[in-house]
Amino acid sequence: MKTPAWSRLAGYAWGVLLWNVLVALFGAYVRATGSGAGCGAHWPTCNGEVIPRAPQVETLIEFTHRATSGLAFLSVLALFLWALRAFPKGHPARFGAGLALFFMVTESLVGASLVLFGWTADNVSRERAVVQMVHLANTYFLLAALALTAWWASGGGPLRLRGQGAVGLALFLGLLALLFLGMSGAVTALGDLLFPVGSTLEALERSLTPGEHFLVRLRVLHPLIAVSVGLYVVFAGYLVAHLRPSPLTRRLAQGLAYLYGAQLLAGLINVALKAPVWMQILHLLLAYAIWLLFVFLATSALERGAKRVELGEGGEAVHRGTGGATWRDYLALTKPRVISLLLFTALFGALIAAKGWPGLGVFLAVALGGYMMAGAANAINMVVDRDIDARMKRTAKRPTVTQRVSSRDALLFAFALAVLGFAVLWWGANLLAATLALMGLIWYVLVYTLYLKRRTWHNIVIGGAAGAFPPLVGWAAVTGELSLFAWYLFALIFFWTPVHFWALALMIQDDYRAVGVPMLPVVLGERATVIQIALYALLTALISLMPLLLGELGLLYLAASLLLNALLLLKSLALYRRPERRTAVSLYKYSMLYLALLFAAMAVDRAV
């Protein structure tokens, strides 16, 4: 039972958390203004004095930071002692307060080492960069410990870490990713201080110049890391809210999405304005807020008694799996036949970008990493849609429906594939290619599967954009950038997708109607569907000719595209005239051949 004393302690704990956030932000102000050496190489005294007399501005800034940090230390110590007195043995708030005190001690020691070893002001050593990252990581841990203490003191329940399956893994990876992002941000901010630039273009040029200082070269990576981590954090947030449904987890997931969007915008403004001090502070404040929000999401999802969709009313595991799963069952989770065309466009995107052979290493990275990322998305889709898959003839034998693979194991398999796929693409190609593959995965799972598929007939048009990411991945893997031609490949698949999938929807519309999925034929009927297919086929044909106007492709592609488009339009017209299964099947099968041959024609044309 919550007592008045506990309520007062909870209020104090929240206040201590807020104070430590402010102290950490002021520490960033000390670094950004170059005031870290304001007290010389003395610690805990300031220039050999307990209280400096007639201090310079830098000295006053540094001394103020030390004084406020000292108050923060005392506030955490008081929180620990109060928690010991107020809560019984075994209460999680006591553990949280003890953890906070530990990280406060290490925070002080790391801060002292920066001063005593001279890793302040204009020092550009690798040691300073490493300690700066450790300092940031320790601050994150301190704030997390204080947040947990406040949560538990406010009545939050203890955590259950065992048996959480993919949810636990997703949250752990999210915390790890945010920690890595914060550390990269700390190094980037240090580079902005020590190696200022006159413009964004100059920053990019210097970042790509061989022989530049490592702090300069690391600057270009932080934005890509930020986008990658942001995509994952938003994805993990909504997935956790789906698997651990509650009003709080849903609000936290939505808050993460909005807050991270604001953070990316702040990052762009920070770069455009050449990292002014006030913008650096705001950027860091948003980073702390995102970190704490994710900590609270993890806490609410892992709390004992939290609702788990993989558990029945009595707490028994459902979709546990019948056992005996083979490698074929796990391969089936990835939907190899569906992936084949995605992988084809990714690999030929690389061939088109390279105007020939891109190299074995890049080709294998795109093939293996691309398959893993797409396979991960498909495995998650099977878990989410297992309820409707069981009632559709086409999908009734999927391993998540027959329960040869449990939902828990399928999700763990999916996350393992996603992590490995991202790593393969980053290591074998570059971070941009890995980020684009992650964007495709998240678009398919969040936008299409979790949001659009069961809500609107526009699901294919908007959600189908996920299938347009593979050629971007292949292109970026070769060039490290996205040109206008790369976006043309994206647009081509985007407009081709409704032609392909609405033809499929016509073939199995009875299944979709039975399970309540609002595909276009179910909502508006066959006539509206075939009209839409014809319109998108015409748009696809027109877009396929655009590279010729830009001078990117020649006569070989012109001949191939004219023939392929003529057949696409003829089959679409045949479906319009006779909207029956036979003509729908014909268009569906040809649309796959159309896209494959069109990409092959581009690759050959650019190579000769």
Curated annotation (Swiss-Prot):
GO terms for biological process: heme A biosynthetic process; heme O biosynthetic process. Keywords: Cell inner membrane, Cell membrane, Heme biosynthesis, Membrane, Transferase, Transmembrane, Transmembrane helix. Pfam families: COX15-CtaA (PF02628), UbiA (PF01040). GO terms for molecular function: oxidoreductase activity, acting on NAD(P)H, heme protein as acceptor; protoheme IX farnesyltransferase activity. The chain crosses the membrane at residues 10-30, 67-87, 99-119, 139-159, 167-187, 220-240, 252-272, 277-297, 338-357, 362-384, 411-431, 432-452, 460-480, 488-508, 530-550, 555-575, 584-604. It is an enzyme of class 2 (transferase). Disulfide bonds: none annotated. NCBIfam families: cyoE_ctaB, PRK04375.1-2. This is Protoheme IX farnesyltransferase. It comes from Thermus thermophilus (strain ATCC 27634 / DSM 579 / HB8).
